[in-house]
Amino acid sequence: YTIASRVEDNKTLADIIQTALDETLKATSQMYVLYDDVGKLTLKNIGDMKMELLIDDETAGDFDYKTSIAAQTYDKVKLSYENKDTGKREIFIAQDSSNINQWGVLQYYEKIDSTANAKVMADALLNLYNTKTRTLKLKNVLGDIRVRAGTMLVVTLGLGDMNLSSYLMVEQVKHTFSNEQHFMDLNMRGGTSVSY
């Protein structure tokens, strides 16, 4: 994906890179992860960070599971473009009526600089945000040093009223080495990947 030229004034390099990653995510629904790989900056598509490592009732210790529509969940996307030639505002909307009926209107609004691919961008944003936010915190998981933030792991757990069996993304990991044992505490995130 090629981002239109832009000026980033008084921004750190990290902020500029994050803006580029955010713009790419909005336009393509593809998430990329930038990380330090033993002194070498590496940029990877999240899909390329899958590991064939299973976390289940036997490899995980304790867990905490939450689901919410309070943050980062939108069932209506509205993009607005101020057309300076006509003096009118152009609106691009994507929405999911079934979720609006279930949750009410949860609207994402953004002003855009160009109408190029505006409808595609609205659809991509709806696809990205039109789901409950699900977080899973796992404690004392058998450790694997290859696991880092951004890694996708297979998680198969019974969570009471539902069964989870899917890849989830590691948002944060803490490795603990003690008495020749290695454990991890993981903050996981997934959207529609949780099966009911």
Which positions does each model-derived feature cover?
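Short acidic/polar beta-strand-loop edge motifs in secreted extracellular
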Residues: 1-19
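Short, solvent-exposed secondary-structure boundary/capping segments
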Residues: 176-189
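Secondary-structure junction/capping motif
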Residues: 12, 190-195
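Acidic, small/polar-enriched beta strand-loop surface segments
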Residues: 18, 22-24, 28-128, 135-176, ...
